Amino acid sequence: MPWIQLKLNTTGANAEDLSDALMEAGAVSITFQDTHDTPVFEPLPGETRLWGDTDVIGLFDAETDMNDVVAILENHPLLGAGFAHKIEQLEDKDWEREWMDNFHPMRFGERLWICPSWRDVPDENAVNVMLDPGLAFGTGTHPTTSLCLQWLDSLDLTGKTVIDFGCGSGILAIAALKLGAAKAIGIDIDPQAIQASRDNAERNGVSDRLELYLPKDQPEEMKADVVVANILAGPLRELAPLISVLPVSGGLLGLSGILASQAESVCEAYADSFALDPVVEKEEWCRITGRKN
Protein backbone atom coordinates (compact mmCIF):
# COMPACT_ATOMS: atom_id res chain seq x y z
CA MET A 1 0.00 0.00 0.00
CA PRO A 2 1.50 3.39 -0.96
CA TRP A 3 1.68 6.24 1.53
CA ILE A 4 2.14 10.00 1.53
CA GLN A 5 4.48 11.66 4.01
CA LEU A 6 4.44 15.30 5.08
CA LYS A 7 7.58 16.66 6.70
CA LEU A 8 7.81 19.77 8.90
CA ASN A 9 10.97 21.27 10.34
CA THR A 10 10.81 22.78 13.81
CA THR A 11 12.59 22.99 17.15
CA GLY A 12 12.57 20.18 19.66
CA ALA A 13 10.43 22.31 21.97
CA ASN A 14 7.63 22.54 19.39
CA ALA A 15 7.85 19.03 17.96
CA GLU A 16 5.23 17.47 20.25
CA ASP A 17 2.69 20.21 19.46
CA LEU A 18 3.16 19.71 15.72
CA SER A 19 2.94 15.96 16.17
CA ASP A 20 -0.49 16.43 17.75
CA ALA A 21 -1.50 18.75 14.90
CA LEU A 22 -0.52 16.17 12.28
CA MET A 23 -2.47 13.45 14.07
CA GLU A 24 -5.54 15.70 14.24
CA ALA A 25 -5.14 16.32 10.49
CA GLY A 26 -5.34 12.58 9.82
CA ALA A 27 -1.79 11.21 10.07
CA VAL A 28 -1.70 7.50 10.90
CA SER A 29 1.79 7.69 12.43
CA ILE A 30 4.41 10.25 13.42
CA THR A 31 8.20 10.03 13.28
CA PHE A 32 10.73 12.43 14.82
CA GLN A 33 14.02 12.75 12.97
CA ASP A 34 17.06 14.90 13.61
CA THR A 35 17.56 17.36 10.78
CA HIS A 36 21.33 16.94 11.12
CA ASP A 37 21.29 13.17 11.77
CA THR A 38 22.53 13.39 15.36
CA PRO A 39 21.35 10.39 17.43
CA VAL A 40 19.50 10.62 20.73
CA PHE A 41 20.66 7.59 22.70
CA GLU A 42 18.90 7.68 26.02
CA PRO A 43 15.49 9.23 26.74
CA LEU A 44 14.49 9.12 30.38
CA PRO A 45 11.45 7.03 31.34
CA GLY A 46 8.29 8.84 30.25
CA GLU A 47 10.23 11.43 28.28
CA THR A 48 10.43 11.93 24.51
CA ARG A 49 13.88 13.38 24.10
CA LEU A 50 14.29 15.48 20.95
CA TRP A 51 16.96 17.37 19.07
CA GLY A 52 17.28 21.14 18.82
CA ASP A 53 16.41 21.04 15.11
CA THR A 54 13.80 18.36 14.47
CA ASP A 55 11.87 17.07 11.46
CA VAL A 56 8.33 15.98 12.33
CA ILE A 57 7.08 13.52 9.72
CA GLY A 58 3.44 12.51 9.37
CA LEU A 59 2.41 9.43 7.38
CA PHE A 60 -0.92 9.60 5.54
CA ASP A 61 -2.99 7.14 3.55
CA ALA A 62 -2.42 7.51 -0.20
CA GLU A 63 -6.06 8.53 -0.70
CA THR A 64 -5.71 11.54 1.61
CA ASP A 65 -6.33 14.96 0.03
CA MET A 66 -3.15 16.73 1.14
CA ASN A 67 -4.60 20.13 0.22
CA ASP A 68 -7.12 19.61 3.00
CA VAL A 69 -4.34 18.58 5.39
CA VAL A 70 -2.30 21.69 4.56
CA ALA A 71 -5.39 23.89 5.03
CA ILE A 72 -5.94 22.43 8.50
CA LEU A 73 -2.31 22.92 9.47
CA GLU A 74 -2.30 26.54 8.29
CA ASN A 75 -4.65 27.31 11.18
CA HIS A 76 -2.12 26.09 13.73
CA PRO A 77 -0.48 28.97 15.65
CA LEU A 78 3.02 27.55 15.12
CA LEU A 79 2.56 27.32 11.35
CA GLY A 80 0.27 29.82 9.62
CA ALA A 81 -0.43 30.42 5.94
CA GLY A 82 2.28 29.31 3.54
CA PHE A 83 4.21 27.33 6.18
CA ALA A 84 7.29 25.44 4.96
CA HIS A 85 6.72 21.74 4.39
CA LYS A 86 7.58 18.87 2.07
CA ILE A 87 5.15 16.27 0.73
CA GLU A 88 6.41 13.00 -0.77
CA GLN A 89 4.75 9.93 -2.24
CA LEU A 90 6.44 6.86 -0.76
CA GLU A 91 7.24 3.89 -2.94
CA ASP A 92 4.95 0.93 -2.43
CA LYS A 93 7.25 -1.75 -0.97
CA ASP A 94 6.85 -4.87 1.09
CA TRP A 95 8.92 -3.40 3.92
CA GLU A 96 8.69 -6.56 6.04
CA ARG A 97 9.91 -8.71 3.15
CA GLU A 98 12.76 -6.28 2.41
CA TRP A 99 13.85 -6.43 6.07
CA MET A 100 13.64 -10.23 6.06
CA ASP A 101 15.77 -10.45 2.93
CA ASN A 102 18.53 -8.46 4.66
CA PHE A 103 18.59 -10.46 7.92
CA HIS A 104 21.17 -13.26 7.56
CA PRO A 105 22.62 -15.88 9.95
CA MET A 106 25.32 -14.43 12.22
CA ARG A 107 28.03 -16.14 14.27
CA PHE A 108 28.98 -15.03 17.79
CA GLY A 109 32.02 -16.46 19.51
CA GLU A 110 33.06 -20.05 18.84
CA ARG A 111 29.79 -21.98 18.96
CA LEU A 112 26.77 -19.73 18.62
CA TRP A 113 24.79 -18.80 15.51
CA ILE A 114 21.70 -16.57 15.43
CA CYS A 115 19.60 -17.55 12.43
CA PRO A 116 16.41 -15.99 11.05
CA SER A 117 13.62 -18.52 11.38
CA TRP A 118 12.96 -18.35 7.63
CA ARG A 119 16.54 -19.27 6.61
CA ASP A 120 18.54 -22.52 6.68
CA VAL A 121 21.21 -22.85 9.35
CA PRO A 122 24.78 -22.67 8.00
CA ASP A 123 26.15 -25.29 10.43
CA GLU A 124 23.91 -28.08 11.73
CA ASN A 125 26.48 -28.96 14.41
CA ALA A 126 26.67 -25.44 15.87
CA VAL A 127 24.51 -23.99 18.64
CA ASN A 128 21.75 -22.48 16.51
CA VAL A 129 19.15 -20.02 17.80
CA MET A 130 16.27 -19.57 15.36
CA LEU A 131 14.93 -16.07 15.79
CA ASP A 132 11.94 -14.03 14.70
CA PRO A 133 12.31 -10.76 16.62
CA GLY A 134 8.74 -9.58 15.95
CA LEU A 135 8.17 -6.14 17.47
CA ALA A 136 10.81 -6.47 20.18
CA PHE A 137 14.43 -5.38 20.11
CA GLY A 138 17.15 -7.95 19.71
CA THR A 139 18.34 -9.60 16.49
CA GLY A 140 22.06 -9.71 17.19
CA THR A 141 22.84 -6.97 14.68
CA HIS A 142 23.35 -4.24 17.27
CA PRO A 143 26.84 -4.06 18.83
CA THR A 144 25.45 -4.34 22.38
CA THR A 145 23.54 -7.54 21.59
CA SER A 146 26.62 -8.89 19.84
CA LEU A 147 28.78 -8.14 22.88
CA CYS A 148 26.36 -10.00 25.17
CA LEU A 149 26.10 -13.02 22.86
CA GLN A 150 29.88 -13.30 22.58
CA TRP A 151 30.16 -13.18 26.37
CA LEU A 152 27.52 -15.88 26.86
CA ASP A 153 29.26 -18.05 24.26
CA SER A 154 32.51 -17.79 26.24
CA LEU A 155 30.95 -19.12 29.47
CA ASP A 156 30.31 -22.65 30.69
CA LEU A 157 26.57 -22.38 31.29
CA THR A 158 25.95 -26.10 31.81
CA GLY A 159 23.28 -26.54 34.49
CA LYS A 160 23.23 -22.82 35.32
CA THR A 161 20.31 -20.44 35.88
CA VAL A 162 20.45 -17.24 33.82
CA ILE A 163 18.43 -14.03 34.21
CA ASP A 164 17.95 -11.84 31.12
CA PHE A 165 16.96 -8.44 32.52
CA GLY A 166 15.21 -6.54 29.71
CA CYS A 167 14.78 -9.60 27.51
CA GLY A 168 13.32 -7.99 24.37
CA SER A 169 13.06 -10.74 21.75
CA GLY A 170 14.44 -13.29 24.23
CA ILE A 171 17.62 -13.67 22.21
CA LEU A 172 19.99 -13.70 25.20
CA ALA A 173 17.90 -15.98 27.42
CA ILE A 174 17.29 -18.43 24.58
CA ALA A 175 20.96 -18.38 23.57
CA ALA A 176 21.90 -19.18 27.18
CA LEU A 177 19.53 -22.15 27.21
CA LYS A 178 20.86 -23.46 23.91
CA LEU A 179 24.39 -23.06 25.29
CA GLY A 180 23.56 -25.40 28.17
CA ALA A 181 21.81 -23.39 30.87
CA ALA A 182 19.25 -25.41 32.81
CA LYS A 183 16.87 -22.49 33.28
CA ALA A 184 16.47 -18.90 32.12
CA ILE A 185 14.30 -16.09 33.41
CA GLY A 186 13.36 -13.19 31.14
CA ILE A 187 12.08 -9.89 32.51
CA ASP A 188 10.77 -6.98 30.44
CA ILE A 189 8.47 -4.00 30.92
CA ASP A 190 6.90 -4.49 27.46
CA PRO A 191 4.18 -7.16 27.04
CA GLN A 192 5.11 -7.39 23.34
CA ALA A 193 8.62 -8.39 24.36
CA ILE A 194 7.23 -11.09 26.63
CA GLN A 195 5.16 -12.46 23.75
CA ALA A 196 8.07 -12.30 21.27
CA SER A 197 10.30 -14.11 23.78
CA ARG A 198 7.66 -16.78 24.34
CA ASP A 199 7.22 -17.33 20.59
CA ASN A 200 10.97 -17.54 20.00
CA ALA A 201 11.41 -19.95 22.92
CA GLU A 202 8.77 -22.26 21.43
CA ARG A 203 10.48 -22.04 18.05
CA ASN A 204 13.73 -23.18 19.67
CA GLY A 205 12.21 -25.92 21.81
CA VAL A 206 13.19 -24.32 25.14
CA SER A 207 9.88 -22.85 26.33
CA ASP A 208 9.69 -25.38 29.18
CA ARG A 209 12.91 -23.95 30.65
CA LEU A 210 12.17 -20.23 30.16
CA GLU A 211 10.16 -18.21 32.68
CA LEU A 212 8.95 -14.78 31.56
CA TYR A 213 7.74 -11.94 33.76
CA LEU A 214 6.67 -8.35 33.68
CA PRO A 215 8.39 -6.56 36.61
CA LYS A 216 5.18 -6.44 38.64
CA ASP A 217 4.83 -10.22 38.38
CA GLN A 218 8.39 -11.36 39.03
CA PRO A 219 9.06 -13.43 42.17
CA GLU A 220 10.48 -11.51 45.13
CA GLU A 221 13.32 -13.97 45.72
CA MET A 222 15.06 -14.47 42.39
CA LYS A 223 18.67 -15.61 42.14
CA ALA A 224 20.80 -16.74 39.21
CA ASP A 225 24.30 -17.91 38.45
CA VAL A 226 24.50 -15.47 35.54
CA VAL A 227 22.67 -12.16 35.05
CA VAL A 228 22.77 -10.27 31.76
CA ALA A 229 21.16 -6.87 31.17
CA ASN A 230 21.32 -5.23 27.76
CA ILE A 231 19.37 -2.04 28.38
CA LEU A 232 20.66 1.57 28.65
CA ALA A 233 23.17 3.27 30.91
CA GLY A 234 20.59 5.38 32.76
CA PRO A 235 18.37 2.46 33.79
CA LEU A 236 21.45 0.35 34.57
CA ARG A 237 22.63 3.00 37.02
CA GLU A 238 19.18 3.58 38.52
CA LEU A 239 18.42 -0.15 38.84
CA ALA A 240 21.86 -1.11 40.18
CA PRO A 241 20.51 -1.88 43.69
CA LEU A 242 17.93 -4.25 42.18
CA ILE A 243 20.18 -5.89 39.58
CA SER A 244 23.10 -6.29 41.99
CA VAL A 245 21.18 -8.64 44.29
CA LEU A 246 20.15 -11.04 41.50
CA PRO A 247 23.44 -12.98 41.09
CA VAL A 248 24.37 -15.55 43.73
CA SER A 249 27.66 -15.07 45.58
CA GLY A 250 30.35 -15.72 42.98
CA GLY A 251 27.80 -15.33 40.19
CA LEU A 252 28.50 -13.46 36.97
CA LEU A 253 27.11 -10.17 35.69
CA GLY A 254 27.11 -8.86 32.11
CA LEU A 255 25.90 -5.36 31.25
CA SER A 256 25.58 -3.64 27.90
CA GLY A 257 23.51 -1.01 26.12
CA ILE A 258 26.24 1.36 27.29
CA LEU A 259 28.18 3.91 25.28
CA ALA A 260 31.91 3.74 25.89
CA SER A 261 31.75 7.26 27.29
CA GLN A 262 29.23 6.07 29.92
CA ALA A 263 31.21 3.05 31.10
CA GLU A 264 32.88 4.75 34.06
CA SER A 265 29.62 5.93 35.63
CA VAL A 266 28.00 2.50 35.20
CA CYS A 267 31.05 0.76 36.69
CA GLU A 268 30.84 3.04 39.72
CA ALA A 269 27.25 1.93 40.33
CA TYR A 270 28.29 -1.76 40.54
CA ALA A 271 31.83 -1.58 41.92
CA ASP A 272 30.83 -2.17 45.55
CA SER A 273 29.11 -5.49 44.78
CA PHE A 274 31.27 -6.92 41.98
CA ALA A 275 34.88 -7.52 41.05
CA LEU A 276 34.72 -5.93 37.61
CA ASP A 277 36.67 -7.02 34.53
CA PRO A 278 38.24 -4.63 32.01
CA VAL A 279 35.59 -2.95 29.85
CA VAL A 280 35.23 -4.45 26.35
CA GLU A 281 34.38 -2.03 23.52
CA LYS A 282 32.76 -2.58 20.12
CA GLU A 283 32.39 0.44 17.88
CA GLU A 284 31.12 3.18 20.24
CA TRP A 285 29.44 0.73 22.64
CA CYS A 286 30.82 -1.40 25.46
CA ARG A 287 30.23 -4.36 27.77
CA ILE A 288 30.88 -4.49 31.50
CA THR A 289 31.28 -7.86 33.22
CA GLY A 290 32.15 -8.93 36.73
CA ARG A 291 31.82 -11.50 39.51
CA LYS A 292 29.64 -11.04 42.60
CA ASN A 293 31.62 -10.49 45.79
Swiss-Prot record:
Location within or outside the cell: Cytoplasm
Protein origin, superkingdom: Bacteria
One annotated Gene Ontology cellular component of this protein: cytosol
Known EC number: 2.1.1.-
Any Pfam family hit: PrmA
InterPro entries for this protein: Ribosomal_L11_MeTrfase_PrmA, Ribosomal_PrmA_MeTrfase, SAM-dependent_MTases_sf
Mutation effect (residue 285 to R): Great decrease in activity
Gene Ontology molecular function, alphabetical: N-terminal protein N-methyltransferase activity; protein-lysine N-methyltransferase activity
The UniProt record lists the keyword Isomerase: no
Catalytic activity entry: L-lysyl-[protein] + 3 S-adenosyl-L-methionine = N(6),N(6),N(6)-trimethyl-L-lysyl-[protein] + 3 S-adenosyl-L-homocysteine + 3 H(+); an N-terminal L-alpha-aminoacyl-[protein] + 3 S-adenosyl-L-methionine = an N-terminal trimethyl-L-alpha-aminoacyl-[protein] + 3 S-adenosyl-L-homocysteine + 3 H(+)
S-adenosyl-L-methionine listed as a keyword: yes
List of residues binding S-adenosyl-L-methionine: 145, 166, 188, 230
UniProt keywords, alphabetically: Cytoplasm, Methyltransferase, S-adenosyl-L-methionine, Transferase
One of the GO biological process terms: methylation
Disruption phenotype: Mutant lacks several methyl groups in protein L11. Null mutant is perfectly viable.
Function as written in the Swiss-Prot or TrEMBL entry: Methylates ribosomal protein L11.
Family to which this protein belongs: Belongs to the methyltransferase superfamily. PrmA family.
Stored PANTHER family: ELECTRON TRANSFER FLAVOPROTEIN BETA SUBUNIT LYSINE METHYLTRANSFERASE (PTHR43648:SF1)
This protein's name: Ribosomal protein L11 methyltransferase
Lineage: Bacteria, Pseudomonadati, Pseudomonadota, Gammaproteobacteria, Enterobacterales
Gene name per UniProt: prmA
